[in-house]
A protein has these predicted regions:
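Hydrophobic core of transmembrane alpha-helices in multi-pass small-molecule transporters
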Residues: 35, 46-62, 168
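C-terminal transmembrane helical hairpin of 12-TM major facilitator-type secondary transporters
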Residues: 216-220, 226, 233-249
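Helix-loop-helix hairpin linking two adjacent transmembrane segments in secondary transporters
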Residues: 87-134
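C-terminal ends and interior cores of transmembrane alpha-helices
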Residues: 30-43, 247-249
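Helix-to-loop junctions at the C-terminal end of transmembrane segments
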Residues: 8-20, 224-235
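Residue-level signature of mid-helix packing/kink "hotspots" within the transmembrane helices
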Residues: 2-10, 95-96, 217-225
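Cytoplasmic helix-loop-helix junction between adjacent transmembrane helices
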Residues: 52-89
């Protein structure tokens, strides 16, 4: 899924450049919802792997990449940093709500039904796409430069290489935490005692794993908004260095 996400990102970027951001995001949402929904009925490892590729391409078309590109082009230069921070924080809000909601649903229904519910919720977000500011109305002039030329210039820029390596480590860390951290919390935790402080928020160790992801998302909201606000007044490369230092620690 993550590999498909990475491979699909430049493909959807080129698609958005040619056909528009709205169409690219809509296609991404459809692929994501379709992949998640059909996964609820998949019965073999091969089918799940194939559907994970579809989901990965869906994320590439509807995730942070294309959405932040729209926001970056639409926001004025003086408000761009904060706007990007708020948008990223909104994505983290889904991490705060999604895992606990999924844990609650899993306690009352099979996982396949939970997949179907989340697929339907994802599909309904298409109604927000028409409200996106069209690329054609952006004050930035259309760039006629070929994609191959742009990539050639980028790989010669040390700043781009550093950002590339930074995002490589970021993606590894994010994928590792998402895949293993909830299970680690569930396996390492003792049974939840009724009436305890933790018991006020969840009643199972599986729910504790979901709660841990929600807590990460909550602090990510704070960090995104703070970084966006600071980016208006401070040099971004130094802020980014501090952020990566904090993540390393």
């Amino acid at each position: 899924q993550n590999l498909a996400w990475g491979i699909g990102t430049p493909i959807f970027s080129a698609f958005a450049e040619k056909y528009g951001d709205r169409k690219a995001i809509t296609l991404g949402l459809i692929l994501y919802a379709l992949g998640v929904f059909i996964s609820s009925t998949a019965s073999s490892p091969e089918a799940h792997q194939f559907l994970n590729i579809i989901i990965g391409f869906g994320i590439a078309g509807s995730g942070f990449g294309p959405v932040l590109a729209v926001v970056g082009r639409s926001a004025s230069p003086e408000k761009r940093s904060l706007s990007l921070g708020i948008t990223t924080a909104a994505g983290s809000a889904g991490q705060v709500i999604g895992p606990p909601f999924a844990a609650i649903l899993l306690s009352t229904m099979p996982w396949s039904s939970v997949f179907e519910i989340f697929a339907i919720i994802s599909l309904f977000t298409i109604i927000l796409v028409p409200f996106l500011k069209s690329k054609d109305t952006s004050p930035i002039k259309k760039n006629e430069e070929k994609l191959s030329d742009a990539i050639g210039q980028a790989i010669k820029d040390p700043t781009y290489i550093m950002l590339f390596l930074g995002f490589f480590s970021c993606g590894f860390q994010l994928a590792f935490i998402t895949a293993h951290f909830p299970a680690f919390i569930a396996e390492a935790s003792s049974p939840i005692v009724k009436g305890s402080f933790i018991g006020l928020f969840c009643n199972s160790v599986e729910g504790l794993g979901a709660l841990s992801m929600a807590i990460i998302g909550l602090f990510n909201i704070i960090g995104c908004i703070l970084a966006g606000a600071l980016g208006k007044n401070f040099t971004k490369k130094y802020l980014l260095s501090l952020i990566y230092t904090g993540r390393t620690i």
